[in-house]
Design a protein with these regions (language model features):
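Alpha-helical transmembrane segments of multi-pass membrane proteins
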Residues: 2-241
Length: 241
């Protein structure tokens, strides 16, 4: 039984391991709190709120304000398109995987964001975070072959409830494992948001740079795998893609 579980774990790429996703969703929580506390009181990790706000403005007849929300939505769409288009070309070069290249790009992106002055229009950072959050969401899709989001918690909450019922009803150990995996993701998201909120009180707009620590941990783990034990698997497509 132990050998079977070990073999199953070995089948996973480094970018599909649960701890990688836990760190990445902590980054997602960090971004969410950062834009809410520091950049205009909005959440930029997903688009549902933007469409609700656009609908509210349309209902009030504020056409110009409504049209603004097409900007973050378009940035999110663009992030998805780019992160769908580039992996094939990056992986074909067989130097590093797309996942690794993306984390390096994300580090550079938020490093640049840290230079945006605190008195600049918050929409600059909002749209920029929309873009990078979209790319992160689309790049990291499954951990341990379980569909996972790394920028928001809605599906994780649903999956906790669903798998809890399956576990209690039939004693399904796989459902129990999935439940705890989703709980870990929620906890990591909250931890990232708490840290971001605390740091914003001291560092202001520069707080975004602290996310570099988490991203660096992921980047070097993925890079080591790409250059080492997974170098002959650079053309293997992660589950969910």
């Amino acid at each position: 039984m132990k050998e079977k579980a070990l073999k199953k774990e070995e089948e996973l790429l480094e970018c599909e391991k649960l701890w990688i996703f836990a760190v990445m969703i902590a980054v997602g929580g960090f971004f969410g709190a950062y834009t809410y506390v520091q950049k205009g009181g909005v959440f930029c990790n997903a688009q549902t709120a933007n469409f609700v706000l656009m609908a509210v403005q349309l209902g009030r007849g504020n056409w110009c304000k409504a049209l603004y929300y097409l900007l973050p939505a378009s940035a999110y769409l663009l992030g998805t398109v780019i992160s769908e288009f580039l992996p094939k070309h990056i992986n074909r070069r067989k130097i590093v995987r797309w996942d690794t290249a993306f984390v390096a790009f994300e580090m550079a992106w938020i490093f640049a964001l840290g230079f945006v002055p605190d008195d600049a229009p918050p929409q600059i950072c909002q749209v920029a975070v929309n873009f990078i959050a979209s790319m992160q969401f689309n790049t990291f899709r499954q951990a341990k072959k379980i569909p996972m989001a790394t920028t928001f918690c809605t599906n994780h909450v649903r999956q906790v409830g669903s798998n809890l019922v399956k576990w209690l009803r039939s004693g399904n150990k796989e459902a129990r494992g999935k439940m705890f995996a989703h709980l870990l993701m929620i906890g990591s998201f909250v931890a990232g948001a708490v840290a971001s909120t605390f740091l914003c009180g001291y560092l202001g707009g520069k707080t975004i740079w602290c996310a570099e620590i988490l991203l660096a941990i992921v980047f070097f783990a993925l890079l080591r795998a790409d250059l080492g034990e997974e170098h002959d698997k650079l053309d293997v497509v992660p589950h969910g893609h």
